[in-house]
Design a protein with these regions (language model features):
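Bacterial N-terminal signal peptides that target proteins for export
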Residues: 1-11
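N-terminal secretory targeting modules
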Residues: 2, 22-204, 214-217, 235, ...
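Structural recognition of the beta-strand scaffold that forms the well-ordered cores
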Residues: 71, 200-205, 209, 239-245, ...
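Alpha-helical scaffolding within the catalytic cores
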Residues: 185, 223-230, 256-272, 306-310
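Catalytic His-Asp segment of secreted/periplasmic serine-dependent ester chemistry enzymes
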Residues: 261, 287, 327-407
Length: 407
């Protein structure tokens, strides 16, 4: 259930479809924690939908926590028509379009082999017993039968190859003659059975959280770096990291995907086991003031601070600790302006001093050039002066104090 709505954009999300469509739900006594997530969005304007009808998709996801049981969340949030998924499987990935022998498990939905997901809805599979180690890659395969789909739900920038093949071949050890996908379609999460002390961090952000310009298929986003560090820390190995970044996303207004304010319930409160929230968002709100295409682009620091405070306050109401991350430098980026830089510096001062957040993660200080604080340290700049490269993401993930997640 959605627990609180913030902002002015109402995003209809139904997390449990009716039993008439999906059958029985999972046992209420089972406790779960999210181990992987991707924030759903409508296929972006200018990007052609892929006609996934009569195709098998094999999507590769990198989980954080391991577990003995797992369940997979499928989504039709932005669909205009019911979405039927059948012959779904989960296995350990063997790299590329192959799966590890002996690890393939069929997924069911209320005991059935297929599910019909209503427009606007998301559903979990039944739990399946698969021993998945932490920080492993899962291959989630499913067949999309011939059907009318006027709109598709996906996560645009996966930074991870997935695969599509003709026909129903979801159980195949290798997808032969598969095409490569750069997005995740119809998937939004994986939960694992919660071990003692299991809890989750949500990283809410834009392309810098999504991992733009990091090496593909290498899991070098800053949330990945944080997740790997946690697994090496005594007492914190059961803390997972859920990446809810969307490239181009904003705090206040829709641009690429729903705004941070409007997707807060779905991407934070509806995730299982969330105890901590890291918010790194606002640079796109600021950047678009330099190339305004409408009144929604005309914002000031006070409005952005208000939006961030709304997110923090709503999380606090649900017992979630909130860590504010300062906005990284963007001098030299295509939408840089002196006015925008003044706004970024003001928002960062507010993040550091307002007391709204339980703690501050100073990504600005970690990544900036000491000789010119408006710009990235050249060693961390991917080259577009807006995003870090692998070294920058490593510095960000390594610069987070793990003590923030001890209680």
């Amino acid at each position: 259930m959605l627990k609180r709505r913030i902002g002015t954009i109402i995003l209809p999300v139904v997390w449990l479809a009716s039993t008439a469509v999906c059958g029985a739900q999972t046992q209420p006594s089972q406790e779960w924690v999210g181990t992987w997530a991707a924030s759903p969005m409508l296929v972006l304007p200018g990007f052609a939908m892929r006609p996934f009808t009569g195709d098998t998709l094999r999507e590769i996801v990198h989980i954080s926590n391991g577990g003995e049981q797992l369940r997979v969340r499928f989504t039709n949030e932005f669909g205009m028509d019911p979405l039927t998924i059948s012959d779904a499987h989960v296995a350990l990935s063997a790299g590329g379009a192959a799966i590890e022998p002996g690890t393939d498990h069929a997924l069911t939905f209320g005991g059935l082999g297929s599910v019909r997901i209503a427009p606007g809805a998301a559903v979990f599979s039944d739990p399946v017993a698969l021993a998945a180690p932490p920080l492993c890659d899962l291959a989630i395969s499913f067949y999309v039968p011939n059907q009318v789909l006027r709109a598709e739900t996906y996560h645009s920038f996966a930074d991870q190859d997935s695969f599509a093949a003709d026909g129903d071949v979801a159980g195949a050890a290798v997808l032969a003659q598969a095409s490569t996908l750069s997005s995740w379609y119809f998937l939004s999460g994986v939960d694992v059975s919660a071990a003692a002390g299991a809890r989750a961090i949500v990283a809410l952000g834009d392309s810098i959280t999504d991992g733009a310009h990091s090496t593909a298929n290498a899991n070098r986003r800053w949330p990945d770096v944080l997740a790997a560090r946690l697994k090496q820390e005594p007492g914190l190995a059961q803390v997972s990291v859920l990446n809810e970044g969307i490239g181009g996303n904003r705090v206040l207004n829709e641009n690429a995907g729903p705004s941070a304010m409007s997707r807060f319930d779905r991407d934070v409160l509806a995730q299982d086991g969330v105890k901590y929230l890291i918010v790194l968002e606002g640079i796109n709100d600021i950047g678009h003031t330099a190339r305004s295409s409408g009144p929604e682009d005309e914002i000031d620091a006070a409005q952005l601070e208000f939006g961030l405070k709304q997110i923090a306050d709503a999380a606090h109401e649900h017992g979630i600790k909130v860590y504010g991350a300062t906005l990284t430098p963007y001098g030299g980026a295509s939408y840089f302006s002196d006015k925008g830089e003044q706004m970024r510096e003001e928002v960062n001062r507010w993040i550091r001093t307002s007391g709204v957040f339980d703690a501050v993660i100073d990504f600005d200080e970690i990544t900036r050039d000491p000789a010119d604080p408006t710009r990235f340290n050249p060693a961390y700049d991917c080259g577009d002066h807006l995003h870090p490269g692998d070294a920058g993401y490593q510095a960000m993930g390594a610069g987070i104090d793990l003590k923030l997640f001890e209680k």
